[in-house]
């Protein structure tokens, strides 16, 4: 049988506090030996080492993302397909556990530039793995398909977004968001606008990834 570990996805602070969810939301996407990334829209480029004459110190995992220049690629024309991912799904009590193989299609659907300045956008394997340089903001759309088909599938999972500080914000929408969680000393403000949930850091402090700057979601999508 499949020996892959059932990996819970949560944010753990130095006090070992974490997001706790029922079993049906407890697992996240994982790579398999067959996982590969294909550019389905746009022209990719190498991860940049400089921007506007300044050296960039990208983290090693960011360099592995798929990078695009906004000067050569526009919104709705940047897309990657991540083939052969897998996620463990089960009922709330842990019964009926099984692995689901999926393809994930990630599309940049909006780009807001800063003073018409071009920059870079990068996408990774996970639904929150994204980086931008030199632009104001962007919107990423994630769609799951049954592996090797064009049949959309709905999955239950959870995600935690960390290090939202220094006037940053994040907006999240899904087919169904079943829970949202922050720490009891959160520094974030909240706004719901239509089907999007926004969390905003209304301060100039860099908290370096503390739990108070994190928000967790359980969702179906």
Positions of PLM-derived features:
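Extended extracellular/luminal ectodomain segments enriched in beta-structured repeat modules
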Residues: 75-77, 148-158
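Extended, low-complexity, turn-rich repeat/linker tracts enriched in Gly/Pro/Ser/Thr and Asp/Glu
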Residues: 90, 132, 149-150, 162-173
